């Protein structure tokens, strides 16, 4: 879920007025709509209906948690969109532990934390596109919500990241070295910070987090 609120004005979820001072969706406020979306960290697929309104079936989701994948895949596939059960990372084909807080299943992370452990398999986004014969040029919005693994996800995309016009990325530890590294990586790839969402405090680790919106220069 984007912390900027709904993407589509008619979504039944409250859009809110904190981020842009109105109750319109994100794309309305950007005066822009995507032709295709790559969404990493699907969870409950709340966004699938909104993406379908703008770009039909041309959206791809990744979900690392196999239980969430099975539970919510129909929410995505009903629109003809694709979903894959992999953990996006900077190395292919590793078996890694995914830590799942029992009371915050939407906060599952490859970074060690309290919670139940399930095993998941990694893939770089570049390899996913090669193996599935997907074309980066068909997607211009990247949405990343991976609870602390955002830098590794970006590294796994490589130079293909310049195909995206906008990147929405949740930064889960504001003020940290991690936040600095993510920002430096994106600016080195030709993006600039367009806007931050309102800040929130995590109920899992107590750290401040927000969504950041980057735009290709």
Language-model segment annotations:
Residues 1-217:
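Phosphate/nucleotide-binding beta-alpha loop and adjacent structural elements of enzyme active sites
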